[in-house]
Amino acid sequence: MEAMMSDDYVDLPYLKRQDETYFVRLWSPPKSVETKAVLVDVHGGAWCDHDRKAGYIYDKQLAQAGYAVAAIDFRCGPAFQHPTASIDVNAAVHWARLLARHIQARSQEVVTIGSSSGGHLALLAALTPYAEEEHGTEIWAKDEWTSPQSIDGSVPAVGAFWAPVDPAARFMYAKSLDNQLGRRLMTNSIAYFESEEAMREASISRVVSEETTARLPRIWFAQAGNDQNVPAEIVQNLEQAYRTAGGVFEITTYPGSPHGFVHAGGEASQKFIRDLVSWLDAIFEARSST
């Protein structure tokens, strides 16, 4: 299968489901720089919009810092419904782990990152890394499609950026807005989750409080200080629930910054990227010493 390329990235197939192929935009470090590890970037878009190109601002800079970044396309609303997207994230992690071995990255472990709804999906996938796969799943590996017996989506850490970690609570907040933003968030939420019950089921706080999870990955949450999209209370509730469950939850707030501020560039965007690289470096350094 022919790859699409530029000077900075290559677009590759990584997943096939029922003859539908999904692509990853792979950002690689400069040839003179050793690859530290492979990251999977899950795009946002209120579970329905955007694609693998959305996070290019930080994906490119992460590559320059030594990380191979696999920015993925995946099934999302309105064509597909929960939990298809998080299941695809697990498949992407499985693929990225194979890639890390193939390119001989310094670390063979994979960390997921995600912006907005992509952060929610990355967290949900990380907490359910062995979700039941579907018949007909194929992974692109060694220049051919293969059908793995099982998918391992486990990761040691997740970076979630201004993520709506409780879809039901965010849906109720969107209802209260009575404006174009609120209507878009409500429409997209229903398009992907179909019901408020499914939104509640997908709450990260509910998962860590009510379900038995094999592993609680470390979380770094980047919070926009002036987020009109995700209320701070939703994030605070997860922070409390995650720590109560025994997980490590780190949060960095960017005062005055709006939802998705990194995409606009500027000083706050650059600080966010520096913070992200520092956190990733610390994660992989700690993993290598254990």
Model regions: which residues?
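Alpha/beta-hydrolase superfamily serine-hydrolase fold, recognizing
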Residues: 1-290
